[in-house]
């Protein structure tokens, strides 16, 4: 049987690279598009080192409509598309909103505008579309408030675009995966979260501070109405998140019905505070990190964690890696880089 061919945009990034490995392990053929703005070509070599297979790779920016059109004229035989390519910092999006609106929305528009309509489409969305939810845990039917950041708003707009596009394309099927907070690294220690610039996410900030790459480490706000005063998030191990994409693809490929549009939360169902993450890192690493406390950061919600019962029921997916193991894998990756 011929392997299904999956296009992974942003496939050398953090989530994209782990998902690429999961796809290859499941027997899919993979093609990656990445502009290397927040990733490295070295990841491609490491994917081959882990899987013994080198996926097809094309370097260009999906916001370039002309290049996208040229690419898809020559390469339009994909069975599925997983779209990761996007800017992803909440804090940076508050400072550079137009960069985020242009990059994240334009790169999406240039995909369904060019690909075959008979395709299974997985979109990398975010729990930021919920804003500050009034009730926890967050379900897929939780009302979407105005997101707290331009980043979150771009994800919300992209969801709307895909929903509208799916309505008019009778053969297009779409799954939206609303991630909570990915953490951890591949068990090989060969790939993990490795931002080109100063990290924006909590765990790589912690690991880079612990190893000496960062000289300062700050917690933004310890006066939130939470159990210890710091923000609470649902931290999803990266290997579980990668598997969620496989489950979503298999759900679409096995479904006899065309023109599906469905949304799933991808988290663990449990929230951890910033202080609890630091404590867990200290426990698995043997460190005793000291940090500064600074004022609250604009764009941060107080608390967010998922209800994942829908993904369990329909996708037959659930998180399996423990929080401590995910934190330890991130630390092992930091030391192996």
Protein language model regions, located:
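N-terminal Rossmann/SDR dinucleotide-binding element
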Residues: 2-80, 198
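Conserved Rossmann-fold NAD(P)-dependent oxidoreductase catalytic core, especially the SDR/UDP-sugar
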Residues: 83, 109-150, 168, 175
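Short alpha-helical oligomerization interface
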Residues: 90-106, 139-147
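NAD(P)-cofactor binding segment of oxidoreductase domains
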Residues: 95-122, 160
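Short-chain dehydrogenase/reductase
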Residues: 101, 148-156, 192-200, 204, ...
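Flexible, glycine-rich beta-alpha linker
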Residues: 130-131, 149-150, 172-199, 226-227
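Active-site Tyr-X1-5-Lys
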Residues: 148-183, 204-212
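C-terminal substrate-binding subdomain of Rossmann-fold SDR/epimerase-dehydratase oxidoreductases
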Residues: 205, 211-337
